[in-house]
Amino acid sequence: MSNIQNMSLEDIMGERFGRYSKYIIQERALPDIRDGLKPVQRRILYSMNKDGNTFEKGYRKSAKSVGNIMGNFHPHGDFSIYDAMVRMSQDWKNREILVEMHGNNGSMDGDPPAAMRYTEARLSEIAGYLLQDIEKNTVSFAWNFDDTEKEPTVLPAAFPNLLVNGSSGISAGYATDIPPHNLSEVIDAVVYMIDHPKASLEKLMEFLPGPDFPTGGIIQGADEIKKAYETGKGRVVVRSRTEIEELKGGKQQIIVTEIPYEVNKAVLVKKIDDVRVNNKVPGIVEVRDESDRTGLRIAIELKKEADSQTILNYLLKYTDLQVNYNFNMVAIDHFTPRQVGLQKILSSYISHRKDIIIERSKFDKAKAEKRLHIVEGLIRVLSILDEIIALIRSSDNKADAKENLKVSYDFSEEQAEAIVTLQLYRLTNTDIVTLQNEENDLRDLITTLSAIIGDEATMYNVMKRELREVKKKFANPRLSELQAESQIIEIDTASLIAEEETFVSVTRGGYLKRTSPRSFNASSLEEVGKRDDDELIFVKQAKTTEHLLLFTTLGNVIYRPIHELTDLRWKDIGEHLSQTISNFATEEEILYADIVTSFDQGLYVAVTQNGFIKRFDRKELSPWRTYKSKSTKYVKLKDDKDRVVTLSPVIMEDLLLVTKNGYALRFSSQEVPIQGLKSAGVKGINLKNDDSLASAFAVTSNSFFVLTQRGSLKRMAVDDIPQTSRANRGLLVLRELKTKPHRVFLAGGVQSDTSAEQFDLFTDIPEEETNQQMLEVISKTGQTYEIALETLSLSERTSNGSFISDTISDQEVLVARTR
């Protein structure tokens, strides 16, 4: 019971997770700054080398190597080992592959490799240089997981693998992304830094100007590369290598021959084809992956009239033909994860190689001295050969002979052992000369090794020579092109849209669609698809390059490029705004719709039930960032019950406002100030407490009509309402009754001396070939009445007009509209 400890769960969890975090940081996800390898990679290379699975020998089953690695060094499951082995064999992931593999080792399309029982692997030749001299006590070893074998904590690394092949990984609280580089350039930078330990970053970048991805591509942003090499963090643009190829018949196609690092080619081709299918950019006929064993090739065939550069710019901006690569150079340095720059990486590598060369030299020197001691003994034996032979013959056994040699001639234990095991053929004159030559060579070697150990300059010369040998053997041209500046991709949005004729329709309830001229002309206007309780308020022919603005009764404006509207048949109901506009309210209705070619110029006037009015500029309605999902305000309403009564382009000088209680006010539109979208406007008419605005319209004719809720209708002259100033009460256009008083339901101009297009503030529905303006009235009992407004006689200002039906007064008006 004494072994039981009482500890809080918080302490236990914190301490255990700290241990776990330290383990996965140091032993799993991050590379060592010296050899650039993660533990699993190091174990794979060491185990394969230990088993003799090297480049000069035949391939072996991957499963055998994986089993040995898992059983001896890495007990974390065969998949993680095989996955790491496969990655080290993929020439599109590594600048210099460390494992050669026969069979399916995956692809740039993200295809999985074949199972390890089918593939074969061996170390690549350059991987041997990472392990070179490991048998000479050059690196420290540690016990494996079950203390049965020892494994290296770092490899000798005869070339700077961390920079050459890069690394990526995610750990607890740390992540790393180090790009691969060109072997020749890295070695040149190391050699220069050996000669100039305090070399500036600018000077080093003359030798190592930037990453070199195995997939090629174009790297843009010299300043960001410098920042990354200085701080360990930075971001560059990596762009595909493309060219425009001419085809027969004046067509063109975009050819992609190199794609950004770590981009899945199959996913990229699919995304480009999605652009074609969804017609996000017109002009793409077909997307083909024509890659084969000769190299990568993606063909994007274009229509004859297509703008190839605009399409390419769009694809660069909205697909992975161009990506950002983020440097995050984190590596384990003295058992600690650190954000490191180029100078730190190079200096750490040089320091590591210094240790390796010195330890190797000490090992070789000790071995040479041991051999020299033996050779000296053998040469001495040859000068007293007869005595030695006689002594050995007189000895009882090998041990006695060795002891006699040591006592009689002062030979050491090692020399005595070499003498008694010497074969007789070695006593010829030829072997005497050979021993003398070997003695001289050993003395020269020991002198050289002593110089390396004792003289830093000599040691660094050896380091440089060995690096140059690696460069000479494995150097290859740079694959990625470096460009100093990141090019800003500018896309002419208009040029991306195929200009087509279409018909746009909008209902009051918020349904909209575009319809092809063929479908529109094949149906009558009345066959439009809509809900029974909805009303078509807008139909107009337009081009797909134009823009649709929808103004609602709640003071919101909705923007839609016409090419983004759903293309449906005329008889289809259309798409409701609530499907895309998150803030479209249930009680909200479309008040006015307008199609514009541009937002350069144009004014609108808005009038609310509370009698406020304002003008605002169309420029302020230029598409906002969230237009696809949210509307924006064009007028601020005074309260929740307030509504916009009229929204119209400013066409004429005078405006006429008519209130529910029958007051009419006429004033110049120039009195209305131009204000921002968020303002509520200014007072247009001075309302009584129980009054509200019923209608507002521009004065475009000589007369206007007034319809009351009881179904009484009259037509009166505009001149009966003389022009005055804004914010007045106005004149009564109805006579007040004590019982069943009339209240204005709708008022508007009567078309007589102007066109319907100029008059109509509420709809642009194409008129039939008639000069008559009709007022359609629907009673609450469902009765429909149509009145030709021009046939009405002019009435006095104070009259209440005439009922449109003998029974309408008892039913009251439900809906009224002009057409």
Swiss-Prot record:
Keywords: Cell membrane, DNA-binding, Isomerase, Membrane, Topoisomerase. Pfam families: DNA_gyraseA_C, DNA_topoisoIV. It catalyses: ATP-dependent breakage, passage and rejoining of double-stranded DNA. InterPro entries: GyrA/parC_rep, Gyrase/topoIV_suA_C, Topo_IIA-like_dom_sf, Topo_IIA_A/C_ab, Topo_IIA_A_a_sf, Topo_IIA_dom_A, TopoIV_A_Gpos, Type_II_DNA_Topoisomerases. The active site is at Y118. One of its GO terms (biological process) is DNA topological change. It comes from the Bacteria. It is an enzyme of class 5 (isomerase). The record marks K38, H74, H76, R87, K93 as: Interaction with DNA. The record marks R117 as: Transition state stabilizer. Residues 30-496 form the Topo IIA-type catalytic domain. Topoisomerase IV is essential for chromosome segregation. It relaxes supercoiled DNA. Performs the decatenation events required during the replication of a circular DNA molecule. PANTHER family: DNA GYRASE/TOPOISOMERASE SUBUNIT A (PTHR43493), DNA TOPOISOMERASE 4 SUBUNIT A (PTHR43493:SF9). This is DNA topoisomerase 4 subunit A. The gene is parC.
